[in-house]
Amino acid sequence: MERVLGIGGYFMRAADPKALNAWYLDCLGMDADEHGLWRQEAGPTVFAAFESETDYFGSRSQQTLLNFRVRDLDAMLAQLRAKGADVSEDIQDVEGVGRFGWVTDPEGNRVEPRQPV
């Protein structure tokens, strides 16, 4: 059986794609080239479906949730706040999984930085 090798890209609609790309690169420290190619570090990726009525993604109109692995959640959230990002005060610790925080990008998408255990 043929299998996928990994996630090859994540694409989202935006009212101002150039500004949104710049926000992700600047605020999250992503080192991408002019075409958006970014080589992520090795690590696990979760693929999971949620109930259609979940409020975990924030707005009901948001159909997906982008989760980024980070080394230090507190440092990442402080970096985001320093850049004026809309960072939630909530942090969730899940035993055996890691620590989760949330930020809303300039287009209103909830994004989840996660510090794995």
What is the predicted function of each stretch?
Residues 1-21, 64-66, 117:
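N-terminal beta-strand motif that seeds the catalytic metal site of vicinal oxygen chelate
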Residues 59-85:
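Mid-chain, well-packed structural core segment of small domains
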Residues 16, 72, 105:
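Acidic di-acidic motifs
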Residues 1-9, 78-117:
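Vicinal oxygen chelate
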Residues 21, 31, 85-88:
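A generic "structured core" feature
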Residues 24:
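Terminal peptide-recognition signature
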Residues 28-63, 103-106, 110-117:
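Conserved short beta-strand elements that form part of the metal-binding/catalytic scaffold
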